[in-house]
Design a protein with these regions (language model features):
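Aromatic- and glycine-enriched pocket-lining scaffold segments that form the walls
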Residues: 140-162
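Beta-propeller domains
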Residues: 19-95, 101-105, 113-139
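Bacterial Sec-dependent N-terminal signal peptides
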Residues: 1-23
Length: 162
């Protein structure tokens, strides 16, 4: 009986699929990785060029939505979004941006940006609505300051209640 239960559990995991918001990464000099198939696939079509901070987000199926170096936001076609330039992050910041889904509006995302350490821009946020511009997204609020000065570090943790 234990063997049957164990085999059932093993087979069941094949039917489970995780959400793939982090399945695609863009970084460095036009580089990227696609983890949708399990093993990483090299991508060479990215638009950003940064030595340090960047952020990427995909939808729950692993399709690229947008990415940023903290200054420019590129859509899934690797073009700058409308209003997507001039964010107050810095690509020399170790964590220039982090993208967080809006908890109440599934088509909106926060981009939190960090300036270089002890610079005047500090931590800011902008809001992307991915339903605009034919599904490619648009920045609807930009560079709303949270705190200054600040360090170059950003992180986010999903709350236990979802």
């Amino acid at each position: 009986m234990k063997k049957i239960a164990f085999c059932f559990l093993l087979v069941s995991f094949n039917f489970l699929t995780a959400q793939k918001e982090a399945a695609i990464w863009y970084f460095g000099e036009n580089a990227g990785l696609d983890f949708n198939t399990g093993a990483p696939i090299t991508l060479l079509d990215g638009a950003l060029n940064t030595r340090e901070g960047c952020a990427t987000i995909s939808d729950v199926n692993g399709s690229l939505l947008f990415y940023t170096d903290g200054i420019t936001v590129w859509n899934s076609n690797h073009q700058p979004m409308p209003n997507g330039t001039g964010l107050l992050g810095d690509p020399s910041s170790t964590q220039s941006a982090i993208i967080v889904p809006h908890p109440g509006i599934p088509t909106q995302f926060y981009i939190f940006t960090a300036d270089k350490i002890k610079e005047v821009n500090g931590i800011n946020y902008s809001v992307v609505d991915i339903s605009l511009d034919g599904g490619l997204g648009d920045i609807i609020q930009k560079n709303i300051q949270l705190v200054t000065p600040s360090a170059e570090k950003l992180t986010a943790v999903k709350h236990a209640n979802g």
